[in-house]
């Protein structure tokens, strides 16, 4: 059993052949989320993976109501083992936005962002953690298209992207969907820069 310690949290990862191991992108999103989240908030993490970011929030903030979604069954089990309430589904599917309890103050997403051709796909469930389609933005664009319906008035999203993903392209998409987009965290790592973009409903 692989475990990671991060501040107050010890994360159980299980089989890393099937579950993405938290790395610099996960840590940067967790740091940004800790600054944005407040007690009493309703928070949704989409594509929670091992549950790392959600577990960090639960360990550090009182009285938050947190739900997560995850498509990978191995990762969903891992998130549950880390104390996260998780629904196994694709993005928002199955969450009905017309119900008040399914509107959130803050929605988090660390999408797969590597530009990936058919020949570059990884076998098995782990592909969902990396494969951003040809542009690297395919899953992110689906998320952005749907996110507004799940936010409370004045709600915010935090998305982790890479310089590979194209910051200006992402900001333009967010603007076209009614979000004010601001960079709130960034970190240079190896061949890329990791960036957290906050989108606030206008």
Language-model regions, residue ranges each:
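Auxiliary N-terminal substrate/complex-recognition segments of SAM-dependent methyltransferases
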Residues: 1-202
